[in-house]
Amino acid sequence: MFKNINSSIEEFEKKFWKAKSAESFNNSLPANSDDPAIQIFKLAMAELIKTKRQSSAIQSARVGRILEIATDTEMKKVEKNFTFLATVGSTAPFIGLFGTVWGIMNSFQSIAISRNTSLAIVAPGIAEALFATALGLLAAILAVVAYNKFNSDTQRYFSKIENFSKRFLSII
C-alpha cells in the first residue's frame, strides 16, 4: 500500500512542476480522489482562489494554514488504521501468557486426575502452553513489525507532502 502511495506523491510532484500553472494542474486533477496529496492540494487551491483579492502576505498565510490543517487531517485518517496493529502488538503476548497458564493448569489437572506424573500425562498440557505462547509472540512480533513499517512509510509520505507544501507556498 505505502509503496504505491509514496510513488504517487513523487508522480504528483513531477506533474505539478511540469504544469503550466497551479490552476491548470488543479483543473487536471480528478474531482473525487482519495489520494491525500490531491485532497490537500485541492483545498489549498480553493483557498488560494478564494483569497485572490487579498494581499499576498494574507493569502500566503491563509493558504499555509489550510495546508497545515489539511495535512494534519489526512495524516490522522491514515494513522487511525494503526490502532489495530498497536493493540495486537501490545496485547498478543498477554493472550499467549494466558494460554500458557491455561496449558499448565491442564497439566496439573491431568496429574491430579491420574495421580501419575509421567511425561505422557504432563506433555499435552505443556505442549498446549508452549503453542499458545508461540502464537501470542508470533502475532505480537508481526503486528509490531507491520506497525513500524507502516508508521515509517507514513512519516516519509507526509514529510514529502510537507516539503511540497513549503515549496508551493514559496511560489504563490
Give residue spans per PLM region.
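Predominantly long cytosolic amphipathic alpha-helical stalk/bundle segments
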Residues: 6-98, 106-118, 145-172
